[in-house]
Amino acid sequence: MMERYLIKVLGRVQGVGFRYFAQSLAGTYSITGTVKNCEDATVRIEAQGEEKNLNKFLAEIRKGNRFVKVEDIVAKKIPTADNEKSFKIVY
């Protein structure tokens, strides 16, 4: 079943390639949506896909990588977006 989440990511997530990291993971797990840096030093993600793929995506986001250090993730379900085809970085 298709789900969509609004996700706020806190930690060392700006200036470290996090948005590209998220975009790459989204491609791996067939996730559509957007990722954007926020003025409060967090990153906002809207992610849509099959629930099992979203769970894998979130688990990988939580792990981060050698540059990214995620301290917390806040996720809530939001209505799905029809006809969304890709995962984009928003500037």
Swiss-Prot record:
One of its GO terms (molecular function) is acylphosphatase activity. Keywords: Hydrolase. Transmembrane segments: none annotated. It catalyses: an acyl phosphate + H2O = a carboxylate + phosphate + H(+). InterPro entries: Acylphosphatase, Acylphosphatase-like_dom, Acylphosphatase-like_dom_sf, Acylphosphatase_CS. Its EC number is 3.6.1.7. The active site is at R19, N37. Belongs to the acylphosphatase family. This is Acylphosphatase. It comes from Clostridium acetobutylicum (strain ATCC 824 / DSM 792 / JCM 1419 / IAM 19013 / LMG 5710 / NBRC 13948 / NRRL B-527 / VKM B-1787 / 2291 / W).
